[in-house]
Amino acid sequence: MTSRIIALICVAAWSAPAAAAPASHAPMRPLPTASDRPLGAGPAYHVDPVNGDAASDGSAKKPWKTVDAAVKRLKPGDTLYLHGGTYFESVTLAVAGTAKAPITIRAVPGELAIIDGGLREFEEAPKAAWEPVKGGAPGEFRSVREFATIRKDSDGGRGVWVLGNFADSMVPLHGYRFEVDLRTDNQLWNVPDNVTPGAGIYVGPGVWFDWETHRIHVRLAHTQVAGQPDNYAGETDPRKLALVIGVDRSALRLDKAAYVRIQDLVLRGSATRTLEIEGSHDVELDGVTIYGGSPAVYVGSTHHLRLVRSVVRGTAAPWSSRASMKYRGNSPYLVIAGSKPPQSHDWELAYDEFTDGHDGIVVDSLKGLAFHHNRIDNFNDDGIYLTLPPRASVPEGIRIYENLVTRVYTALAFAEADDRSANPIGPGVYLYRNVFDLRDGTYGWIPKDAAGAATLSPSRMCGDHGSPTWEPLFFYHNTVINPGSAFRDYYGEQMVMGTKGTKRRLFNNVFIQVDGNPGLHVPGPNDDVMADGNLLWGMRTGPGFQGDFFAKRKARPGPDGFGAHDVFADPRLAHLVDGEPVLDLRPRGGGVVDAGVAVPTEWPDSLRAADRGKPDIGALPLGAPMLQVGPTAAPKR
Protein backbone atom coordinates (compact mmCIF):
# COMPACT_ATOMS: atom_id res chain seq x y z
CA MET A 1 0.00 0.00 0.00
CA THR A 2 1.40 3.36 -0.95
CA SER A 3 1.13 6.13 1.60
CA ARG A 4 -0.53 9.34 0.52
CA ILE A 5 1.78 12.18 -0.31
CA ILE A 6 0.81 14.75 2.26
CA ALA A 7 2.73 17.37 0.40
CA LEU A 8 1.27 20.45 1.97
CA ILE A 9 1.59 19.27 5.50
CA CYS A 10 5.31 19.43 6.05
CA VAL A 11 6.22 15.81 6.73
CA ALA A 12 9.92 15.82 7.36
CA ALA A 13 11.67 13.05 5.47
CA TRP A 14 15.17 11.74 5.81
CA SER A 15 17.04 12.03 2.54
CA ALA A 16 19.44 9.41 1.31
CA PRO A 17 21.98 9.52 -1.48
CA ALA A 18 21.29 7.66 -4.69
CA ALA A 19 22.36 4.03 -4.48
CA ALA A 20 22.08 0.82 -6.44
CA ALA A 21 18.71 -0.89 -6.19
CA PRO A 22 18.65 -3.38 -3.31
CA ALA A 23 18.74 -7.06 -4.23
CA SER A 24 15.91 -7.68 -1.79
CA HIS A 25 13.18 -5.06 -2.06
CA ALA A 26 12.92 -1.31 -2.26
CA PRO A 27 13.24 0.29 1.19
CA MET A 28 9.95 1.20 2.85
CA ARG A 29 11.51 4.36 4.27
CA PRO A 30 14.64 6.40 3.60
CA LEU A 31 17.63 4.64 5.12
CA PRO A 32 19.65 6.43 7.80
CA THR A 33 22.54 8.60 6.72
CA ALA A 34 25.50 10.11 8.53
CA SER A 35 24.90 13.24 10.60
CA ASP A 36 26.79 16.50 10.21
CA ARG A 37 26.48 17.42 13.89
CA PRO A 38 29.68 19.33 14.79
CA LEU A 39 32.21 17.92 17.23
CA GLY A 40 31.54 18.81 20.84
CA ALA A 41 33.76 20.31 23.49
CA GLY A 42 35.38 18.54 26.41
CA PRO A 43 37.29 15.27 26.83
CA ALA A 44 36.83 12.98 23.83
CA TYR A 45 37.42 9.29 23.26
CA HIS A 46 37.04 7.19 20.14
CA VAL A 47 36.01 3.68 19.18
CA ASP A 48 36.37 2.08 15.75
CA PRO A 49 34.97 -1.35 14.77
CA VAL A 50 37.61 -1.88 12.07
CA ASN A 51 40.77 -0.09 13.19
CA GLY A 52 40.26 -0.10 16.94
CA ASP A 53 42.18 -2.07 19.55
CA ALA A 54 41.22 -2.92 23.11
CA ALA A 55 44.76 -2.09 24.21
CA SER A 56 44.70 1.41 22.71
CA ASP A 57 44.25 4.63 24.67
CA GLY A 58 40.94 5.65 23.07
CA SER A 59 42.36 8.64 21.24
CA ALA A 60 41.38 9.59 17.71
CA LYS A 61 44.57 7.99 16.39
CA LYS A 62 44.39 4.95 18.67
CA PRO A 63 40.69 4.17 19.14
CA TRP A 64 39.25 1.40 21.23
CA LYS A 65 37.61 -1.58 19.55
CA THR A 66 34.23 -2.10 21.22
CA VAL A 67 31.56 0.23 22.51
CA ASP A 68 30.65 -1.94 25.49
CA ALA A 69 34.18 -1.85 26.86
CA ALA A 70 34.65 1.83 26.06
CA VAL A 71 31.55 3.11 27.86
CA LYS A 72 32.73 1.59 31.14
CA ARG A 73 35.65 4.05 31.15
CA LEU A 74 33.59 7.19 30.72
CA LYS A 75 33.39 9.93 33.34
CA PRO A 76 31.15 13.02 33.64
CA GLY A 77 31.75 15.40 30.76
CA ASP A 78 33.26 12.76 28.46
CA THR A 79 32.18 12.19 24.87
CA LEU A 80 32.62 8.84 23.16
CA TYR A 81 32.76 9.08 19.37
CA LEU A 82 31.78 6.04 17.33
CA HIS A 83 33.48 5.87 13.95
CA GLY A 84 31.57 4.56 10.97
CA GLY A 85 30.76 0.89 10.65
CA THR A 86 28.76 -1.80 12.38
CA TYR A 87 29.42 -2.72 16.00
CA PHE A 88 28.13 -6.25 16.53
CA GLU A 89 27.56 -5.90 20.25
CA SER A 90 24.99 -5.76 22.98
CA VAL A 91 26.02 -2.62 24.82
CA THR A 92 25.12 -1.96 28.46
CA LEU A 93 25.41 1.62 29.61
CA ALA A 94 25.47 1.97 33.41
CA VAL A 95 27.26 5.28 33.85
CA ALA A 96 26.28 8.63 35.28
CA GLY A 97 27.21 12.10 34.23
CA THR A 98 26.01 15.23 36.00
CA ALA A 99 23.62 18.01 35.09
CA LYS A 100 26.54 20.26 34.18
CA ALA A 101 28.71 17.51 32.71
CA PRO A 102 26.62 14.87 30.93
CA ILE A 103 28.14 11.85 29.22
CA THR A 104 27.66 11.74 25.44
CA ILE A 105 27.81 8.71 23.14
CA ARG A 106 27.53 9.72 19.51
CA ALA A 107 28.65 9.16 15.92
CA VAL A 108 31.61 10.95 14.40
CA PRO A 109 30.39 13.71 12.03
CA GLY A 110 29.96 12.37 8.51
CA GLU A 111 30.16 8.71 9.57
CA LEU A 112 27.28 6.27 10.04
CA ALA A 113 27.67 4.18 13.19
CA ILE A 114 25.43 1.15 13.78
CA ILE A 115 25.13 -0.83 17.00
CA ASP A 116 23.80 -4.21 15.92
CA GLY A 117 22.80 -6.73 18.56
CA GLY A 118 22.37 -9.39 15.89
CA LEU A 119 24.44 -12.29 14.64
CA ARG A 120 27.46 -11.19 12.70
CA GLU A 121 27.93 -14.02 10.22
CA PHE A 122 24.60 -13.49 8.48
CA GLU A 123 25.61 -9.96 7.53
CA GLU A 124 29.31 -10.33 6.88
CA ALA A 125 29.64 -13.90 5.54
CA PRO A 126 26.20 -15.12 4.47
CA LYS A 127 27.61 -17.58 1.92
CA ALA A 128 29.26 -19.58 4.69
CA ALA A 129 26.53 -19.02 7.28
CA TRP A 130 23.62 -20.82 5.59
CA GLU A 131 23.13 -24.33 4.24
CA PRO A 132 20.19 -25.87 2.36
CA VAL A 133 17.77 -27.90 4.47
CA LYS A 134 17.63 -31.53 3.39
CA GLY A 135 14.00 -32.47 2.91
CA GLY A 136 12.91 -28.90 3.54
CA ALA A 137 10.82 -26.60 1.42
CA PRO A 138 12.15 -25.18 -1.85
CA GLY A 139 14.50 -22.35 -0.98
CA GLU A 140 14.67 -23.22 2.73
CA PHE A 141 18.05 -22.79 4.42
CA ARG A 142 19.28 -23.15 7.98
CA SER A 143 22.21 -21.77 9.92
CA VAL A 144 25.40 -23.79 9.75
CA ARG A 145 25.99 -22.98 13.39
CA GLU A 146 23.85 -23.96 16.37
CA PHE A 147 22.60 -21.31 18.80
CA ALA A 148 22.04 -23.24 21.99
CA THR A 149 22.17 -20.24 24.33
CA ILE A 150 18.99 -18.54 23.11
CA ARG A 151 16.67 -18.24 26.11
CA LYS A 152 13.36 -20.05 25.87
CA ASP A 153 11.58 -17.27 27.77
CA SER A 154 12.78 -14.52 25.44
CA ASP A 155 9.78 -14.85 23.12
CA GLY A 156 7.34 -12.97 25.34
CA GLY A 157 4.93 -15.88 25.06
CA ARG A 158 4.53 -15.48 21.30
CA GLY A 159 6.60 -18.45 20.12
CA VAL A 160 8.94 -16.28 18.04
CA TRP A 161 12.61 -16.29 19.01
CA VAL A 162 14.21 -14.79 15.91
CA LEU A 163 13.49 -11.61 13.95
CA GLY A 164 15.34 -9.97 11.12
CA ASN A 165 15.64 -7.53 8.24
CA PHE A 166 17.16 -7.43 4.80
CA ALA A 167 20.35 -5.47 5.48
CA ASP A 168 20.27 -3.68 2.12
CA SER A 169 16.77 -2.25 2.57
CA MET A 170 15.92 -2.87 6.24
CA VAL A 171 12.61 -4.36 5.13
CA PRO A 172 11.58 -6.68 7.99
CA LEU A 173 11.56 -10.47 7.82
CA HIS A 174 8.54 -12.24 9.26
CA GLY A 175 9.19 -14.02 12.55
CA TYR A 176 7.43 -17.37 12.10
CA ARG A 177 5.61 -19.11 14.94
CA PHE A 178 4.93 -22.32 13.06
CA GLU A 179 7.37 -24.45 11.10
CA VAL A 180 4.66 -25.45 8.64
CA ASP A 181 4.00 -21.81 7.74
CA LEU A 182 7.62 -21.28 6.71
CA ARG A 183 7.60 -24.42 4.54
CA THR A 184 4.24 -24.42 2.81
CA ASP A 185 3.61 -23.03 -0.66
CA ASN A 186 0.05 -22.09 0.29
CA GLN A 187 -0.44 -18.32 0.44
CA LEU A 188 -4.19 -18.22 1.13
CA TRP A 189 -5.88 -17.87 4.52
CA ASN A 190 -7.54 -21.30 4.40
CA VAL A 191 -6.16 -22.57 7.71
CA PRO A 192 -8.70 -24.23 10.07
CA ASP A 193 -8.20 -21.66 12.82
CA ASN A 194 -6.31 -18.40 13.11
CA VAL A 195 -3.77 -19.81 15.57
CA THR A 196 -3.82 -23.50 14.60
CA PRO A 197 -0.95 -24.53 12.31
CA GLY A 198 -3.03 -26.74 10.02
CA ALA A 199 -1.49 -27.12 6.58
CA GLY A 200 0.15 -23.73 7.04
CA ILE A 201 0.23 -20.42 5.23
CA TYR A 202 3.35 -18.75 3.89
CA VAL A 203 3.19 -15.01 4.59
CA GLY A 204 6.48 -13.79 3.17
CA PRO A 205 10.25 -13.91 3.63
CA GLY A 206 11.04 -14.85 7.18
CA VAL A 207 12.92 -16.76 9.83
CA TRP A 208 12.08 -19.52 12.30
CA PHE A 209 14.02 -21.05 15.21
CA ASP A 210 14.12 -24.85 15.54
CA TRP A 211 14.33 -25.76 19.22
CA GLU A 212 15.30 -29.36 18.46
CA THR A 213 18.43 -28.47 16.51
CA HIS A 214 18.99 -24.90 17.77
CA ARG A 215 19.34 -23.78 14.16
CA ILE A 216 17.85 -20.68 12.57
CA HIS A 217 15.84 -21.38 9.42
CA VAL A 218 15.19 -18.85 6.66
CA ARG A 219 13.11 -18.83 3.51
CA LEU A 220 12.90 -15.95 1.06
CA ALA A 221 10.36 -17.34 -1.40
CA HIS A 222 8.35 -14.89 -3.46
CA THR A 223 4.80 -13.95 -2.53
CA GLN A 224 2.08 -13.89 -5.17
CA VAL A 225 -1.05 -12.69 -3.40
CA ALA A 226 -3.36 -10.74 -5.68
CA GLY A 227 -4.56 -7.46 -4.30
CA GLN A 228 -2.28 -7.19 -1.29
CA PRO A 229 -0.31 -3.95 -0.96
CA ASP A 230 2.92 -5.45 -2.25
CA ASN A 231 4.64 -8.75 -2.99
CA TYR A 232 8.20 -9.93 -2.52
CA ALA A 233 10.02 -10.60 -5.80
CA GLY A 234 13.68 -10.23 -4.79
CA GLU A 235 16.61 -12.57 -4.23
CA THR A 236 15.62 -15.94 -2.75
CA ASP A 237 19.05 -17.31 -1.80
CA PRO A 238 20.12 -15.99 1.64
CA ARG A 239 23.74 -16.82 0.82
CA LYS A 240 23.66 -13.94 -1.66
CA LEU A 241 22.18 -11.39 0.75
CA ALA A 242 23.26 -9.78 3.97
CA LEU A 243 20.58 -10.31 6.62
CA VAL A 244 20.21 -8.66 10.01
CA ILE A 245 19.29 -11.56 12.32
CA GLY A 246 18.30 -10.63 15.86
CA VAL A 247 17.92 -13.00 18.79
CA ASP A 248 17.56 -12.58 22.56
CA ARG A 249 19.74 -9.57 23.24
CA SER A 250 19.30 -5.83 22.97
CA ALA A 251 21.47 -3.58 20.89
CA LEU A 252 21.64 -1.04 23.73
CA ARG A 253 20.64 -1.18 27.40
CA LEU A 254 20.70 1.73 29.80
CA ASP A 255 20.75 0.42 33.36
CA LYS A 256 20.51 3.07 36.07
CA ALA A 257 22.17 5.57 33.77
CA ALA A 258 21.93 9.28 34.44
CA TYR A 259 22.67 12.47 32.54
CA VAL A 260 23.46 10.61 29.35
CA ARG A 261 23.03 11.75 25.74
CA ILE A 262 22.85 9.34 22.79
CA GLN A 263 23.21 11.02 19.41
CA ASP A 264 23.06 10.02 15.73
CA LEU A 265 23.37 6.25 16.16
CA VAL A 266 21.51 3.39 14.49
CA LEU A 267 20.26 0.60 16.77
CA ARG A 268 19.11 -2.70 15.28
CA GLY A 269 19.38 -6.49 15.44
CA SER A 270 17.17 -7.77 18.25
CA ALA A 271 14.22 -10.10 18.64
CA THR A 272 13.56 -8.61 22.06
CA ARG A 273 13.98 -4.98 23.14
CA THR A 274 16.24 -3.23 20.67
CA LEU A 275 16.63 -0.35 23.11
CA GLU A 276 15.96 -0.95 26.80
CA ILE A 277 16.11 1.75 29.45
CA GLU A 278 15.56 0.83 33.10
CA GLY A 279 15.81 2.84 36.30
CA SER A 280 17.47 5.80 34.61
CA HIS A 281 17.01 9.55 34.55
CA ASP A 282 17.96 12.60 32.53
CA VAL A 283 18.47 10.65 29.33
CA GLU A 284 18.28 12.23 25.88
CA LEU A 285 18.24 10.40 22.56
CA ASP A 286 18.66 12.75 19.61
CA GLY A 287 18.87 11.78 15.95
CA VAL A 288 18.69 8.07 16.68
CA THR A 289 17.28 5.42 14.31
CA ILE A 290 15.84 2.32 15.99
CA TYR A 291 14.61 -0.82 14.25
CA GLY A 292 12.36 -3.22 16.16
CA GLY A 293 12.63 -5.54 18.01
CA SER A 294 9.83 -6.74 20.23
CA PRO A 295 9.44 -3.95 21.08
CA ALA A 296 11.78 -1.49 19.42
CA VAL A 297 11.91 0.57 22.63
CA TYR A 298 11.11 -0.38 26.23
CA VAL A 299 11.48 2.13 29.05
CA GLY A 300 10.74 1.40 32.70
CA SER A 301 10.96 3.51 35.87
CA THR A 302 12.76 6.33 34.11
CA HIS A 303 12.25 10.05 34.50
CA HIS A 304 13.27 13.07 32.46
CA LEU A 305 13.58 11.21 29.18
CA ARG A 306 13.74 12.94 25.79
CA LEU A 307 13.47 11.20 22.43
CA VAL A 308 13.80 13.86 19.73
CA ARG A 309 14.54 14.06 16.00
CA SER A 310 14.54 10.27 15.86
CA VAL A 311 12.86 7.48 13.90
CA VAL A 312 11.52 4.21 15.27
CA ARG A 313 10.59 1.50 12.77
CA GLY A 314 8.55 -1.60 13.46
CA THR A 315 8.48 -5.15 12.12
CA ALA A 316 5.79 -4.86 9.43
CA ALA A 317 6.95 -5.55 5.88
CA PRO A 318 5.07 -4.20 2.83
CA TRP A 319 3.22 -7.56 2.58
CA SER A 320 2.52 -7.90 6.32
CA SER A 321 -1.14 -8.00 7.31
CA ARG A 322 -2.81 -7.59 10.66
CA ALA A 323 -3.73 -11.28 10.51
CA SER A 324 -0.26 -12.53 9.58
CA MET A 325 1.37 -10.65 12.45
CA LYS A 326 -1.33 -11.18 15.08
CA TYR A 327 -1.96 -14.88 14.50
CA ARG A 328 0.98 -16.38 12.62
CA GLY A 329 3.95 -14.45 13.98
CA ASN A 330 4.91 -11.78 16.42
CA SER A 331 2.74 -8.70 16.94
CA PRO A 332 4.88 -6.40 19.04
CA TYR A 333 4.29 -2.91 20.29
CA LEU A 334 6.71 -0.36 18.91
CA VAL A 335 7.33 1.66 22.09
CA ILE A 336 6.36 0.65 25.62
CA ALA A 337 6.42 2.77 28.74
CA GLY A 338 6.54 0.07 31.40
CA SER A 339 3.99 0.46 34.18
CA LYS A 340 5.81 -1.21 37.08
CA PRO A 341 6.76 1.10 39.96
CA PRO A 342 8.39 3.45 40.44
CA GLN A 343 6.36 5.43 37.93
CA SER A 344 8.12 6.97 34.95
CA HIS A 345 7.61 10.71 34.62
CA ASP A 346 8.54 13.85 32.73
CA TRP A 347 9.03 12.60 29.20
CA GLU A 348 9.19 14.42 25.89
CA LEU A 349 8.81 12.59 22.57
CA ALA A 350 9.04 15.20 19.84
CA TYR A 351 9.77 15.57 16.12
CA ASP A 352 9.99 11.80 15.72
CA GLU A 353 8.64 9.23 13.29
CA PHE A 354 6.93 6.09 14.59
CA THR A 355 6.10 3.76 11.71
CA ASP A 356 5.46 0.32 10.26
CA GLY A 357 4.25 -2.08 12.88
CA HIS A 358 1.36 -3.96 14.42
CA ASP A 359 0.76 -1.95 17.60
CA GLY A 360 2.28 1.45 18.19
CA ILE A 361 2.96 3.35 21.38
CA VAL A 362 1.94 2.53 24.96
CA VAL A 363 1.92 5.61 27.21
CA ASP A 364 -0.89 4.72 29.61
CA SER A 365 1.09 4.85 32.88
CA LEU A 366 3.21 7.99 32.56
CA LYS A 367 3.11 11.08 34.71
CA GLY A 368 4.00 14.02 32.53
CA LEU A 369 4.34 13.49 28.77
CA ALA A 370 4.71 16.02 25.97
CA PHE A 371 4.13 14.07 22.75
CA HIS A 372 4.28 16.51 19.86
CA HIS A 373 5.25 17.14 16.24
CA ASN A 374 5.50 13.41 15.56
CA ARG A 375 4.43 11.34 12.60
CA ILE A 376 2.57 8.10 13.34
CA ASP A 377 2.06 6.01 10.20
CA ASN A 378 1.28 2.47 9.08
CA PHE A 379 0.13 0.36 12.04
CA ASN A 380 -2.18 -2.49 11.15
CA ASP A 381 -3.72 -2.64 14.63
CA ASP A 382 -3.56 0.02 17.35
CA GLY A 383 -1.69 3.31 17.19
CA ILE A 384 -1.57 4.98 20.62
CA TYR A 385 -2.62 3.02 23.70
CA LEU A 386 -4.13 5.22 26.41
CA THR A 387 -5.57 2.38 28.54
CA LEU A 388 -3.75 -0.96 28.78
CA PRO A 389 -4.18 -2.64 32.18
CA PRO A 390 -2.89 -4.11 34.37
CA ARG A 391 -0.81 -1.12 35.37
CA ALA A 392 0.58 0.15 38.64
CA SER A 393 -0.02 3.80 37.71
CA VAL A 394 -2.56 5.75 35.71
CA PRO A 395 -1.63 8.46 33.21
CA GLU A 396 -1.42 12.03 34.42
CA GLY A 397 -0.35 15.20 32.66
CA ILE A 398 -0.44 13.63 29.19
CA ARG A 399 -0.37 16.17 26.35
CA ILE A 400 -0.60 14.88 22.77
CA TYR A 401 -0.50 17.75 20.29
CA GLU A 402 0.49 18.83 16.79
CA ASN A 403 1.01 15.29 15.49
CA LEU A 404 0.11 13.75 12.14
CA VAL A 405 -1.53 10.31 12.29
CA THR A 406 -2.07 8.31 9.10
CA ARG A 407 -2.84 4.69 8.11
CA VAL A 408 -3.67 3.27 11.53
CA TYR A 409 -6.40 0.69 11.99
CA THR A 410 -7.32 2.18 15.40
CA ALA A 411 -5.68 5.51 16.15
CA LEU A 412 -6.55 5.71 19.88
CA ALA A 413 -6.85 2.38 21.69
CA PHE A 414 -8.21 1.25 25.04
CA ALA A 415 -8.01 -2.30 26.41
CA GLU A 416 -9.61 -4.34 29.16
CA ALA A 417 -7.54 -6.34 31.65
CA ASP A 418 -7.21 -10.04 30.84
CA ASP A 419 -9.25 -10.92 33.92
CA ARG A 420 -11.87 -8.32 32.94
CA SER A 421 -11.47 -6.53 36.25
CA ALA A 422 -12.36 -2.85 36.50
CA ASN A 423 -9.47 -0.57 35.65
CA PRO A 424 -8.71 2.69 37.44
CA ILE A 425 -8.41 5.83 35.35
CA GLY A 426 -6.43 9.03 35.63
CA PRO A 427 -7.50 12.69 35.58
CA GLY A 428 -7.53 12.90 31.80
CA VAL A 429 -5.50 12.98 28.59
CA TYR A 430 -5.31 16.18 26.53
CA LEU A 431 -5.31 15.79 22.73
CA TYR A 432 -5.24 18.99 20.70
CA ARG A 433 -4.06 20.50 17.40
CA ASN A 434 -3.52 17.05 15.85
CA VAL A 435 -4.32 15.92 12.32
CA PHE A 436 -5.78 12.44 11.92
CA ASP A 437 -5.81 11.79 8.17
CA LEU A 438 -7.40 8.35 8.11
CA ARG A 439 -8.41 8.26 4.45
CA ASP A 440 -6.13 5.30 3.76
CA GLY A 441 -6.60 1.97 5.49
CA THR A 442 -4.24 -0.83 6.47
CA TYR A 443 -3.76 -4.40 5.30
CA GLY A 444 -6.10 -6.56 7.36
CA TRP A 445 -6.58 -10.05 5.92
CA ILE A 446 -5.04 -12.30 3.31
CA PRO A 447 -7.58 -13.75 0.82
CA LYS A 448 -9.22 -17.00 1.87
CA ASP A 449 -9.35 -18.42 -1.65
CA ALA A 450 -8.12 -17.66 -5.14
CA ALA A 451 -11.35 -15.87 -6.00
CA GLY A 452 -11.18 -13.68 -2.92
CA ALA A 453 -9.50 -10.34 -2.41
CA ALA A 454 -7.07 -9.05 0.14
CA THR A 455 -8.92 -7.07 2.81
CA LEU A 456 -7.86 -3.50 3.40
CA SER A 457 -9.31 -2.40 6.72
CA PRO A 458 -10.47 1.23 6.91
CA SER A 459 -8.65 3.32 9.49
CA ARG A 460 -10.75 4.50 12.42
CA MET A 461 -10.39 7.09 15.11
CA CYS A 462 -10.73 4.95 18.22
CA GLY A 463 -11.78 1.59 19.59
CA ASP A 464 -11.39 -0.80 22.48
CA HIS A 465 -10.66 -4.40 23.39
CA GLY A 466 -13.30 -5.79 25.72
CA SER A 467 -15.14 -3.25 27.84
CA PRO A 468 -12.55 -1.13 29.64
CA THR A 469 -13.22 2.17 31.30
CA TRP A 470 -11.61 4.66 28.96
CA GLU A 471 -9.27 7.35 30.18
CA PRO A 472 -11.01 10.72 30.40
CA LEU A 473 -10.36 12.54 27.14
CA PHE A 474 -10.14 16.25 26.44
CA PHE A 475 -10.21 16.34 22.65
CA TYR A 476 -10.23 19.80 21.13
CA HIS A 477 -8.96 21.71 18.10
CA ASN A 478 -8.18 18.59 16.06
CA THR A 479 -8.89 17.80 12.42
CA VAL A 480 -10.12 14.29 11.62
CA ILE A 481 -10.67 12.95 8.10
CA ASN A 482 -12.34 9.55 7.83
CA PRO A 483 -13.03 7.55 4.66
CA GLY A 484 -16.59 6.46 5.50
CA SER A 485 -19.23 5.84 8.11
CA ALA A 486 -18.19 5.42 11.72
CA PHE A 487 -19.06 2.31 13.71
CA ARG A 488 -22.77 2.45 14.64
CA ASP A 489 -22.89 5.92 13.11
CA TYR A 490 -21.28 7.42 16.21
CA TYR A 491 -20.91 11.18 16.44
CA GLY A 492 -17.41 12.58 16.18
CA GLU A 493 -16.03 9.67 14.13
CA GLN A 494 -16.54 7.33 17.10
CA MET A 495 -15.11 9.73 19.68
CA VAL A 496 -18.25 9.27 21.80
CA MET A 497 -17.71 5.53 22.21
CA GLY A 498 -16.81 4.14 25.62
CA THR A 499 -18.29 6.96 27.69
CA LYS A 500 -19.54 4.88 30.61
CA GLY A 501 -17.80 5.70 33.88
CA THR A 502 -15.51 8.32 32.40
CA LYS A 503 -15.41 11.92 31.16
CA ARG A 504 -15.30 13.12 27.56
CA ARG A 505 -14.98 16.63 26.16
CA LEU A 506 -15.05 17.35 22.41
CA PHE A 507 -14.70 21.00 21.44
CA ASN A 508 -13.83 22.83 18.22
CA ASN A 509 -12.87 19.80 16.15
CA VAL A 510 -13.31 19.34 12.40
CA PHE A 511 -14.82 15.94 11.54
CA ILE A 512 -14.76 15.32 7.79
CA GLN A 513 -16.08 12.17 6.16
CA VAL A 514 -15.18 11.40 2.55
CA ASP A 515 -18.09 9.09 1.72
CA GLY A 516 -21.44 9.93 3.33
CA ASN A 517 -22.09 12.38 6.11
CA PRO A 518 -20.67 12.15 9.65
CA GLY A 519 -22.58 10.18 12.26
CA LEU A 520 -24.96 11.67 14.81
CA HIS A 521 -25.42 8.86 17.34
CA VAL A 522 -24.69 10.37 20.76
CA PRO A 523 -24.40 9.01 24.33
CA GLY A 524 -27.31 8.88 26.71
CA PRO A 525 -28.24 11.86 28.90
CA ASN A 526 -26.53 10.44 32.00
CA ASP A 527 -23.02 10.13 30.58
CA ASP A 528 -20.46 12.79 31.46
CA VAL A 529 -19.97 13.94 27.88
CA MET A 530 -19.88 17.44 26.49
CA ALA A 531 -19.41 18.40 22.85
CA ASP A 532 -19.73 21.79 21.23
CA GLY A 533 -18.32 23.98 18.51
CA ASN A 534 -17.48 21.06 16.23
CA LEU A 535 -17.75 21.25 12.45
CA LEU A 536 -19.09 18.20 10.61
CA TRP A 537 -18.90 17.78 6.86
CA GLY A 538 -19.36 15.14 4.16
CA MET A 539 -17.04 15.75 1.22
CA ARG A 540 -19.20 13.97 -1.35
CA THR A 541 -22.72 14.29 0.04
CA GLY A 542 -22.48 17.47 2.08
CA PRO A 543 -22.80 19.95 -0.80
CA GLY A 544 -26.14 18.46 -1.89
CA PHE A 545 -27.68 18.11 1.57
CA GLN A 546 -30.78 20.16 2.32
CA GLY A 547 -32.58 20.73 5.59
CA ASP A 548 -31.47 20.61 9.22
CA PHE A 549 -28.55 18.20 9.37
CA PHE A 550 -28.80 17.91 13.16
CA ALA A 551 -32.55 17.19 13.27
CA LYS A 552 -32.01 13.49 13.85
CA ARG A 553 -29.73 14.14 16.80
CA LYS A 554 -32.04 16.73 18.32
CA ALA A 555 -34.91 14.24 18.29
CA ARG A 556 -33.03 11.87 20.62
CA PRO A 557 -32.26 12.49 24.29
CA GLY A 558 -28.64 13.24 24.99
CA PRO A 559 -26.46 15.17 27.41
CA ASP A 560 -27.66 18.71 28.09
CA GLY A 561 -26.39 21.23 25.58
CA PHE A 562 -24.67 18.61 23.46
CA GLY A 563 -23.52 20.18 20.18
CA ALA A 564 -25.49 23.38 20.69
CA HIS A 565 -23.06 25.36 18.53
CA ASP A 566 -22.02 22.63 16.12
CA VAL A 567 -22.09 23.44 12.42
CA PHE A 568 -22.54 21.40 9.27
CA ALA A 569 -20.60 23.26 6.62
CA ASP A 570 -17.70 23.15 4.21
CA PRO A 571 -14.63 23.91 6.36
CA ARG A 572 -13.07 25.82 3.44
CA LEU A 573 -9.56 24.50 3.88
CA ALA A 574 -6.69 25.45 1.57
CA HIS A 575 -6.50 22.09 -0.21
CA LEU A 576 -8.70 19.10 0.51
CA VAL A 577 -10.01 17.54 -2.71
CA ASP A 578 -11.76 14.21 -3.04
CA GLY A 579 -9.40 11.73 -4.68
CA GLU A 580 -6.29 13.88 -4.38
CA PRO A 581 -3.60 12.85 -1.91
CA VAL A 582 -2.18 16.30 -1.24
CA LEU A 583 -3.49 18.01 1.85
CA ASP A 584 -3.30 21.55 3.19
CA LEU A 585 -5.51 22.11 6.22
CA ARG A 586 -4.90 25.82 6.68
CA PRO A 587 -8.19 27.76 6.68
CA ARG A 588 -8.98 29.95 3.66
CA GLY A 589 -11.52 32.03 5.57
CA GLY A 590 -15.14 31.36 6.48
CA GLY A 591 -16.06 27.81 7.39
CA VAL A 592 -14.00 27.13 10.51
CA VAL A 593 -12.93 30.73 11.17
CA ASP A 594 -14.36 32.30 14.36
CA ALA A 595 -16.92 29.47 14.50
CA GLY A 596 -15.76 27.70 17.66
CA VAL A 597 -16.60 28.01 21.33
CA ALA A 598 -14.46 29.07 24.26
CA VAL A 599 -12.22 26.36 25.69
CA PRO A 600 -11.17 26.53 29.36
CA THR A 601 -7.99 28.56 29.64
CA GLU A 602 -6.45 26.01 32.00
CA TRP A 603 -6.41 23.45 29.19
CA PRO A 604 -3.09 23.49 27.34
CA ASP A 605 -3.07 24.83 23.78
CA SER A 606 0.15 25.26 21.81
CA LEU A 607 -1.51 27.58 19.26
CA ARG A 608 -3.80 29.61 21.51
CA ALA A 609 -1.80 32.79 20.93
CA ALA A 610 -2.11 32.36 17.15
CA ASP A 611 -5.91 32.02 17.28
CA ARG A 612 -7.11 35.62 17.17
CA GLY A 613 -10.69 36.65 17.86
CA LYS A 614 -13.22 33.92 18.53
CA PRO A 615 -11.74 30.40 18.46
CA ASP A 616 -11.34 28.86 15.04
CA ILE A 617 -12.33 25.22 14.59
CA GLY A 618 -9.78 22.55 13.76
CA ALA A 619 -6.07 21.92 14.14
CA LEU A 620 -4.84 25.13 12.54
CA PRO A 621 -6.17 28.65 13.17
CA LEU A 622 -6.35 31.21 10.39
CA GLY A 623 -2.87 32.51 9.57
CA ALA A 624 -0.98 29.68 11.24
CA PRO A 625 1.82 27.97 9.29
CA MET A 626 1.56 24.43 8.01
CA LEU A 627 1.79 21.65 10.56
CA GLN A 628 5.37 20.40 10.57
CA VAL A 629 6.28 16.98 11.91
CA GLY A 630 9.25 14.64 11.90
CA PRO A 631 12.99 14.98 12.49
CA THR A 632 13.94 17.69 10.02
CA ALA A 633 11.04 19.88 11.13
CA ALA A 634 12.66 20.24 14.54
CA PRO A 635 14.26 23.51 15.59
CA LYS A 636 17.92 23.73 14.69
CA ARG A 637 20.32 22.35 17.27
Q: PLM features: residue spans?
A:
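Short beta->alpha connector loops
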Residues: G85-Y87, S270, I290-G293, L366
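Extracellular polysaccharide-degrading/modifying enzymes targeting complex plant/algal/animal polysaccharides
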Residues: A23-S270, E276, W319-G329, L585-G589, ...
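Positively charged n-region of N-terminal signal peptides that target proteins for export
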Residues: M1-R4
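Glycine- and acidic/polar-rich repeat regions and solenoidal domains
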Residues: A251-R253, T272-E276, S294-G300, H304, ...
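Bacterial N-terminal signal peptides
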Residues: I6-A16
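Extracellular beta-helix/beta-solenoid repeat scaffolds
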Residues: A101, R106, G110, I115, ...
